């Protein structure tokens, strides 16, 4: 199947030129290209058009889960008939294993896996190995961490078809080998159940279970069915059943891995004893032997990723397999907000390694644990085929890769202009700012204020609150999902002014913001660099009255670059509007986010505990419990479909409680 773009929009402004230039570059085998696209110019739509024209599997890389979810929603809408997948870290919560030598404290790994994201990750790898060419994966940088060997994953795919000679017993053995678990109770993802000559399988990567009918030693019928009604959805001639887990391993590979682990354990114990580290030697022996016993019995153990090098049959020091290994060689990589994503990729390896070194040195892990890691930056570069960097402010790295040449997209189809920038003296800046805020509030518009330090932001929040301004302060301790909720509250008008140290959140869509105020704009540094200020000013670019005020006593080089670049973009847009008779139109954007709890999420200033929805406390009969379990599962699945993982996790926990109560009632 081919990529087929579905949209009511036609490329406009700079988009047709940008699309043609990028497509020509790909067809001419250019390895690196940069799309310099301003806020609101439709960069995602441009990339969607490029993907439709070049027709190659595509990886879109974002630097956090929230942006990945936003991009996933947009690409899913553009390509409703194609395989648009979402691949991010499946941890709701993750505390990595660590040892702090100074205090002698060992921190055990603690985590909570989001089953819905795990299903979407499996859906991604299954789609990529299916041979389909119309696969677009939106991923966070977590896709550069190690996952299972694609060859082992492919080896454990079960292919069946109608009329095939296959015993029921052999088929069940194949399912177990592919990490499906037989069940007689709840029929969940990664389970199969047997009723006479019929075997039901619930793939780990799909919403739709499969039913296989046997007649003797022959497959008589294959069909998909509705889990709730049990009705047939579709009859299938043939089917590939992909493993229920990415870390699937063949029995012969598992045995070879166990032998290698034992050999390395002996060597490391001998090393520790030779340098007088008897405590470390004893600790490593006990921990590793316990893990080996678990692997022999169950095929896995807690922390099995630390043995991934053995299971992947990789030499010491080699890079792990990652999502990119599942793509064909001719894939396209799009790095969104590249000025932020590339540095994040560059920093991943170092942070992981320092933690692992302590675990190995003090006998908590074998040295092979060091090879369970994210890619080094040079390994990431070596895996690239063709890359498009996308940013409103490309960094030197991207421009150097492209020889200083970039594709420009500064015209907005809506006709909206870049904000006007004013420079005002820093003396009496707070009084002046208060006046400007009051003007915006009267027009039902919002304001962003960026300060240099947390303390300044806190003091300004207190002062404005005292002056009866409805304001909030956002800081680095606020997690991603809560930050999105705060942004939504700003858009809804629950408060008027958002204050923070670093508000240049890439991809932030806030059409209601008409004023961005930058305090102490002349204090050179990371937060007042040309790139940072251009991003910050751009937050007002989606409002028809958008403007920015820089409070400063002198104009720095960074300020000058930002002012000149913004003026150039304004002029270009004005000329385009004049030539084509376009009147700038205000942007009306629905207040929602793929990760939010609802289209408009409630957020309270005080940290009041939110009421748990659908949380029964009264004693229930067995029948009532079963009904409640069914209803809760439906709510969990509905939340998951909307990518509302917080709410889905709440229903998941509630479901576990109800299932435990049901089990107790049957004793």
Regions found by a protein language model. Name each.
Residues 1-2, 439, 575, 579-650, ...:
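Acidic, low-complexity intrinsically disordered tails
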């Amino acid at each position: 199947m081919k990529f087929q773009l579905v949209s009511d929009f036609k490329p406009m402004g700079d988009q047709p030129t940008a699309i043609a230039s990028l497509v020509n570059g790909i067809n001419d085998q250019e390895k690196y290209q940069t799309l310099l696209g301003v806020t609101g110019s439709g960069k995602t739509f441009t990339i969607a058009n490029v993907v439709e024209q070049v027709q190659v599997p595509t990886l879109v890389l974002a630097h956090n889960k929230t942006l990945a979810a936003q991009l996933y929603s947009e690409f899913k809408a553009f390509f409703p008939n194609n395989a648009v997948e979402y691949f991010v870290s499946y941890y709701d919560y993750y505390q990595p294993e660590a040892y702090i030598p100074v205090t002698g404290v060992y921190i055990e790994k603690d985590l909570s896996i989001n089953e819905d994201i795990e299903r979407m990750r499996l859906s991604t790898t299954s789609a990529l190995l299916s041979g389909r060419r119309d696969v677009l994966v939106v991923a966070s940088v977590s896709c550069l961490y190690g996952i299972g060997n694609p060859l082992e994953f492919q080896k454990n795919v079960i292919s069946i078809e109608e009329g095939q000679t296959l015993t029921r017993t052999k088929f069940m053995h194949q399912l177990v080998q592919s990490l499906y678990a037989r069940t007689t109770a709840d029929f969940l993802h990664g389970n199969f159940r047997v009723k006479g000559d019929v075997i039901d399988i619930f793939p780990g990567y799909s919403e739709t279970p499969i039913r296989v009918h046997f007649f003797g030693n022959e497959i008589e019928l294959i069909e998909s069915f509705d889990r709730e009604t049990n009705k047939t959805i579709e009859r299938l001639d043939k089917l590939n059943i992909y493993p229920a887990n990415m870390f699937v391993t063949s029995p012969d590979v598992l045995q070879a891995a166990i032998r290698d682990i034992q050999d390395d354990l002996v060597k490391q114990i001998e090393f520790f004893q030779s340098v007088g580290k008897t405590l470390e030697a004893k600790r490593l022996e006990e921990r590793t032997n316990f893990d080996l016993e678990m692997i022999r019995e169950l095929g896995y153990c807690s922390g099995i990723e630390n043995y991934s090098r053995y299971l992947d049959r990789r030499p010491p020091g080699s890079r792990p397999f990652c999502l990119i290994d599942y793509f064909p060689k001719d894939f396209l990589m799009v790095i969104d907000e590249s000025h932020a994503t590339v540095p994040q990729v560059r920093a991943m390896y170092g942070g992981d390694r320092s933690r692992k070194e302590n675990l190995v040195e003090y006998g908590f892990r074998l040295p092979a644990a060091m090879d369970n890691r994210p890619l080094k930056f040079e390994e990431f570069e070596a895996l690239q085929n063709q890359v498009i960097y996308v940013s409103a402010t490309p960094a030197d790295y991207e421009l150097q890769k492209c020889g200083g040449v970039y594709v420009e997209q500064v015209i907005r189809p809506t006709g909206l202009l870049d904000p006007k920038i004013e420079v005002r003296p820093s003396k009496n800046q707070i009084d002046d700012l208060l006046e400007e805020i009051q003007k915006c509030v009267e027009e039902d518009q919002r304001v962003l204020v960026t300060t240099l330090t947390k303390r300044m932001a806190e003091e300004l929040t207190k002062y404005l609150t005292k002056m009866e301004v409805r304001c909030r302060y956002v800081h680095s301790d606020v997690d991603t999902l809560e930050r999105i909720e705060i942004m939504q509250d700003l858009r809804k008008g629950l408060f008027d002014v958002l204050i923070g140290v670093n508000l240049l959140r890439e991809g932030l869509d806030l059409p209601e913001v008409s004023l961005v105020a930058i305090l102490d704009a002349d204090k050179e540094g990371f937060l007042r660099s040309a790139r940072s200020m251009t991003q910050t000013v751009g937050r007002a670019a989606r409002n028809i009255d958008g403007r920015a005020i820089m409070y400063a006593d002198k104009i720095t080089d960074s300020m000058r670059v930002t002012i000149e670049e913004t003026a150039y973009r304004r002029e270009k847009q004005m000329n385009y509007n004049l030539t084509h008779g376009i009147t700038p139109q205000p942007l009306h954007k629905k207040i929602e986010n793929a990760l939010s709890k609802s289209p408009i999420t409630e957020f309270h200033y005080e940290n009041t505990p939110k009421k748990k929805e659908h949380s029964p406390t009264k004693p229930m009969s067995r029948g009532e419990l079963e009904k409640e379990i069914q209803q809760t599962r439906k709510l969990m699945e509905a939340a998951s479909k909307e990518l509302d993982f917080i709410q889905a996790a709440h229903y998941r926990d509630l479901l576990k409680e109800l299932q435990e109560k049901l089990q107790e009632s049957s004793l």
